């Protein structure tokens, strides 16, 4: 939208649906940032109805972004996956594969990579972590009950997942953090992040601990007091994600460094890294006047806009 507004001919390519990364999470999960930090349309109806300090659910944010694309008739090819990029600045040739496996080619002068960082889960390098009972995304969960569920990872994804599951299941949460750090996070979950009714029941927390094996649906946990074992039915290993390694090895020799002012790739001029690839997340892309404090008063999409205006001598609108 921003680049179209300065007169550039722009095409978006999305390998699945719009907001594919967000669809990996449970649709009722509350976002920790305010909607006004993330919303694209200043006239967004949810923002108008709920106000600047509203914590949206995942499904509401997906709807907001989908409505934005439709409202401005953004040219986005869904179910098209970027396979490779040949050529150089001003003369790129993109290989794209559609949902039926057919490959086509597109020409471009510049390429903005905004593929996110959730393609591949981080692994712990322990036995059993690739078992079918080990999940790396917290998505479908409403049907889970009367199970022994192990959570690995000390972030809010684990905390949110445990709050959702603990009323009907038995939970073990293994974290490397200290007890004070976990208590602080749970306090923030109930206060700053809007989940005022969050409550842990049926949950044991092992702090300053780590799982060393998941084989045969038995977790072996190294704790400050020695090793413990815990049989589980389902494990959520929520220790982060990373970009598709194969793709960025091909495109950028695995080098994700970029110019902080323009976001242009250091490895391959003409390619730009934005969003989670540049470690600038949803709250850094909003187009309203309500800027997230964490982004130091800068709307990062403006850097891309300024760089492109200079490259193509655009005046903007």
Label each residue range with its predicted role:
Residues 104-118, 150-152, 230-241, 273:
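Short hydrophobic core segments
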Residues 57, 104, 113-171, 256-268, ...:
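Glycine-rich dinucleotide-binding loop and its adjacent helix/turn
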Residues 46-67, 77-78, 178-192, 285-289:
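Short beta-strand to alpha-helix junction loop
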Residues 1-25, 170-182:
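Glycine-rich FAD pyrophosphate-binding loop
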Residues 13, 17-63, 278-284:
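Glycine-rich active-site loop/strand segments that organize a redox cofactor
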Residues 27-29, 249-273, 277-283:
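FAD-binding beta-loop-beta segment adjacent to the flavin cofactor pocket
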Residues 269, 273-317:
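A conserved FAD-binding loop/helix module that cradles the flavin
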Residues 73, 77-80, 84, 91, ...:
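A Rossmann-like FAD-binding core segment of flavoenzymes
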């Amino acid at each position: 939208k921003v680049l179209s507004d300065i007169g550039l001919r722009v095409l978006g390519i999305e390998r699945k649906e719009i907001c594919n990364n967000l669809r990996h999470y449970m649709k009722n999960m509350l976002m920790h940032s305010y909607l006004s930090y993330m919303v694209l349309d200043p006239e967004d109806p949810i923002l108008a109805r709920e106000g600047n300090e509203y914590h949206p659910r995942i499904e509401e944010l997906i709807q907001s972004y989908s409505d934005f694309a439709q409202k401005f008739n953004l040219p986005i090819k869904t179910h098209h996956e970027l396979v490779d990029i040949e050529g150089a600045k001003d003369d790129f040739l993109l290989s794209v594969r559609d949902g039926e496996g057919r490959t086509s080619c597109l020409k471009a002068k510049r390429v903005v990579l905004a593929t996110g960082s959730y393609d591949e889960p981080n692994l712990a390098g322990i036995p059993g972590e690739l078992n079918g009972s080990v999940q790396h995304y917290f998505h479908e969960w409403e049907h889970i009950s009367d199970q022994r569920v192990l959570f690995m990872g000390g972030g809010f994804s684990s905390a949110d997942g445990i709050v959702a599951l603990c009323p009907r299941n038995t939970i073990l949460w293994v974290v490397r953090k200290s007890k004070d750090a976990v208590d602080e996070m749970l306090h923030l979950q109930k206060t700053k992040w809007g989940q005022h009714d969050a409550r842990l029941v049926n949950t044991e927390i092992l702090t300053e601990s780590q799982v060393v094996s998941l084989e045969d649906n038995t977790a072996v946990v190294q704790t400050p007091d020695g090793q413990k074992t815990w049989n589980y039915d389902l494990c959520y290993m929520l220790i982060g994600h990373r970009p598709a390694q194969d793709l960025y090895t091909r495109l950028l020799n695995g080098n994700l460094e970029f110019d902080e002012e323009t976001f242009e790739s250091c490895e391959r001029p003409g390619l730009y890294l934005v969003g989670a690839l540049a470690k600038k997340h949803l709250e850094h892309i909003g187009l309203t006047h309500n800027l997230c404090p964490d982004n130091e008063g800068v709307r990062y999409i403006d850097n891309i806009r300024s760089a492109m205006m200079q490259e193509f001598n655009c005046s903007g609108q």
